[in-house]
From Swiss-Prot:
NDH shuttles electrons from NAD(P)H:plastoquinone, via FMN and iron-sulfur (Fe-S) centers, to quinones in the photosynthetic chain and possibly in a chloroplast respiratory chain. The immediate electron acceptor for the enzyme in this species is believed to be plastoquinone. Couples the redox reaction to proton translocation, and thus conserves the redox energy in a proton gradient. Coiled coil: none annotated. This is NAD(P)H-quinone oxidoreductase subunit H, chloroplastic. NDH is composed of at least 16 different subunits, 5 of which are encoded in the nucleus. The keyword Translocase applies. It holds the Pfam family Complex1_49kDa. Its main location: plastid. Belongs to the complex I 49 kDa subunit family. GO terms for molecular function: NAD binding; oxidoreductase activity, acting on NAD(P)H, quinone or similar compound as acceptor; quinone binding. It is a peripheral membrane protein. NCBIfam families: PRK06075.1 (NF004739), PRK07415.1 (NF005649). GO terms for biological process: photosynthesis, light reaction. GO terms for cellular component: chloroplast thylakoid membrane. It comes from Nephroselmis olivacea.
Length: 391
């Protein structure tokens, strides 16, 4: 029997393909339907976010950061204010910390919802997409009532939040939580045991725990591989230790495990929001003192180098000559900022550690030997946003 030998075919997927989740290009080498190699090409959405940060004060830079991961903007704002707060040792009032946690967890739910809808659409299931957008709109209505904006919120400030939530907002948010928990059960009833869905995701794109650690993966990608690592438990930032919740993880490390982790995280986030709303303390929502110089009150000379501000944190807030790495558990993984201050209003160095950029690097490893159709499944399960990958 004579075997016909064919040359490998090179296919360029993207950068404008709808299932690329942004301007990502994949150069795929195929032997028939089988993937021999895959090379991601990133950088189409690079805007120089790190260099912009080094030429702006923190207050000026805050509106820019919502353009990294534009579907989970609360987290990019949180990391931007947390870095100078830790560097200058600025305390955040308890009420502001609770409000931050509520906003962060609502943002996590919205991000996971907008991951689930397109992921199912990539697999050919269009129906869940419309249900998911219905709930996401409700979260955006809550954001609009509290911050004035549906997406680019610009709500976090150095030392607190921009404003307290309006009258009746807490009750409305509690009503949403009561409404949303049964909806997650509805998604699971629609999706989880569907035989077509299971054939597309079970055993596809498997990552072992050791692989996940070696590649530096974080977030649901890491927890789906059996590594129970969540920065909300590890670093205990904001006031997460005040609430009762557990880290969601799976053992199999495939696309199904990543789906299950995110579905359960939506439930966990809703329960954290409920606890925070029921036990939110009174008091100010912003720390109205900012340290102008690194000495603070302990200066042996006088009190002039410690500045009390009547209103907002000053745009001339100086960052001490120190360096610090700050991280938060974003919906896609560990979002970090390495900040070097220089006794100046501008940061000397502002290095962003985006989870999407780290997580997408394992993609060529996962798709080798798989079918062409599995690329969409695996890429969708990673959950990337190109604004954050390219910065």
């Amino acid at each position: 029997m004579i075997e016909a030998k064919t040359d490998p075919m090179i296919v360029s997927m993207g950068p404008h393909h709808p299932s690329m989740h942004g301007v990502l290009r994949l150069i795929v080498t195929l032997d028939g339907e089988n993937v021999l190699d895959c090379e991601p090409v990133v950088g189409y959405l690079h805007r120089g976010m790190e260099k912009i940060a080094e030429n702006r004060t923190i207050v000026q830079y805050l509106p820019y950061v919502t353009r990294w991961d534009y579907l989970a903007t609360m987290f990019t704002e949180a990391i931007t204010v947390n870095a100078p707060e830790r560097l200058a040792n600025i305390e955040v009032p308890r009420r502001a910390s609770y409000l931050r946690v509520i906003m962060l967890e609502l943002s996590r739910i919205a991000s996971h919802l907008l991951w689930l809808g397109p992921f199912m659409a990539d697999l050919g299931a269009q129906t869940p997409f419309f249900y998911i957008l219905r709930e996401r709109e409700m979260i955006y209505d809550l954001f609009e009532a509290a911050t004035g904006m549906r997406m680019m919120h610009n709500y976090f400030r150095v030392g607190g939040v921009a404003a307290d939530v309006p009258y009746g907002w807490i009750d409305k948010c509690l009503d949403f939580c009561e409404y949303f928990l049964p909806k997650v059960d509805e998604y699971e009833a629609l999706i989880t045991r569907n035989p077509i869905f299971l054939k597309r995701v079970k055993g596809v794109g498997t990552i072992s725990p050791q692989q996940a650690i070696n590649w530096g993966l974080s977030g649901p990608m890491l927890r789906a591989s059996g590594v129970s690592w969540d920065l909300r438990k590890v670093d205990r930032y904001e006031c997460y230790e005040d609430f009762h919740w557990s880290v969601e993880s799976e053992e199999t490390g495939d696309c199904l495990a990543r789906y299950l982790v995110r579905i359960r995280e939506m439930r966990t986030s809703t329960k954290i929001v409920q606890q925070a709303l029921k036990s939110i303390p009174g008091g100010p929502t912003e720390n109205l003192e900012a340290r102008q110089l690194s000495q603070g009150r302990t200066s042996p000379w006088n009190e002039f180098d410690y500045q009390f501000l009547g209103k907002k944190a000053s745009p001339t807030f100086k960052m001490p000559r120190q360096e610090h790495y700050v991280r938060v558990e974003a919906p896609k993984g560990e979002l970090g900022v390495f900040l070097i201050g220089d006794d100046h209003v501008f940061p000397w160095r502002w290095k962003i550690r985006p989870p999407g950029f780290i997580n997408v690097q394992i993609l060529p490893n996962l798709v080798q030997g798989m079918k062409l159709a599995d690329i969409m499944t695996i890429l969708g399960s990673i959950d990337i946003i190109m604004g954050e990958v390219d910065r």
